[in-house]
Amino acid sequence: MFLLPRFCLVCSIIGTFGFENPPTNVVSHFNDDWFLFGDSRSDCNHVVNTNPRNYSYMDLNPALCDSGKISSKAGNSIFRSFHFTDFYNYTGEGQQIIFYEGVNFTPYHAFKCTSAGNNDIWMQNKGLFYTQVYKKMAVYRSLTLVNVPYVYNGSAQPTAFCKSGSLILNNPAYIAREANVGDYYYKSEADFSLSGCDEYIVPLCIFNGKFLSNTKYYDDSQYYFNKDTGVIYGLNSTETITTGFDFNCHYLVLPSGNYLAISNELLLTVPTKAICLNKRKVFTPVQVVDSRWNNARQSDNMTAVACQLPYCYFRNSTSNYVGIHDVNHGDAGFTSILSGLLYDSPCFSQQGVFRYDNVSTVWPLFPFGNCPTAASIISSDLPICVYDPLPIILLGILLGVAVIVIVVLLLYFMVDNGIRQHYA
């Protein structure tokens, strides 16, 4: 208890001199082992190809363009490349992973498989997809997209009926009905294989509703069977609705192996692309920056829904996106968020990134890294610091020893002085 006045005095001195070390609203990294996935707002190659060269197009600081730590493509996103013919092979590796993409598949694009479809289902798909990606990249270093080879023994070819605007679905592939089959009540199969990666994220999708064709209604049914382990993954249509439904996707995490895609009704689907996950690492939360349009266009919050603690930290600006190149490119708030990539930081938390690991006036929530020893402020002037008890105990012991030494020395000199006076 005798340490408490000194303890509070130290905290008061820190507060007096203004060393508050607050969390900052940025994405950053502990060291040089990081990687960013993005779109045009961090696509240095897109900027280089514009004439004249204009870095105001980006939210990323141009000093990072030659870092080799960025995989970005103007007009694209990982979700868009995963499902559609508009493809870019996002590839990167790092201990600390940052995502700043997703805006290129939003309600603004209004995608739905058919004219009677539902874009809300695709927003749900987007959220489920990024949930798996963020969770897995907290424990894997490497992400890339790979093709999935498959063998279908029939003569029918994949159909491109699931399309809207410039977007054409090609993952999963939708195998058309064989010419000699009269309706959609038939069983169809295709072999596919996964090899070369530690794990894969693959789509398993169905039309969850009554699909009408030639006055008959069909219930979709799709399965993937692992021929090596005997495990089966499946979805069956459960809804009775006949309009307003669309392609519901689940995103399975599968091991390498030989698989059989099976359809018992409607059309056969088989994955053609997968997220390839490699090199397991010590759990390190990913960081996600909100990816949205200027308010003149409709955006969604699916990356925020997917980014949940403890595997993900979400960063956002409090204001509308207003770019300086155009309204959708070069926003000051998001440029500020990405500026944290210019330097190392020791601690990530729910509130933000801490620049220093000694003390702070804010207690880090869901901290990760070497975080400051601090707690909340109970008054505007006096932070109450909570330290590791070991240094406090050692300090107490040292102070106690110092007091004993001082007392002994005082007694010694008092006795010695008395003896001298006696002999004098």
Curated annotation (Swiss-Prot):
Q: How does it sit in the membrane?
A: Single-pass type I membrane protein
What is the protein's major site of localization?
virion
Q: Please name the catalytic residues of this protein.
A: S40, D326, H329
Residue ranges for the region (Esterase domain 1) are 7-127
Q: Which reaction does it catalyse?
A: N-acetyl-9-O-acetylneuraminate + H2O = N-acetylneuraminate + acetate + H(+); N-acetyl-4-O-acetylneuraminate + H2O = N-acetylneuraminate + acetate + H(+)
Intrachain S-S bonds: C44-C65, C113-C162, C197-C276, C205-C249, C307-C312, C347-C371
Q: Does the keyword Glycoprotein apply?
A: yes
List, in alphabetical order, the Gene Ontology terms for molecular function in this entry: host cell surface receptor binding; sialate 4-O-acetylesterase activity; sialate 9-O-acetylesterase activity; sialate O-acetylesterase activity
What GO biological process, any one, is recorded here? fusion of virus membrane with host plasma membrane
Chain spans, region Receptor binding: 128-266
What name does this protein carry? Hemagglutinin-esterase
| Lineage of producing organism | Viruses, Riboviria, Orthornavirae, Pisuviricota, Pisoniviricetes
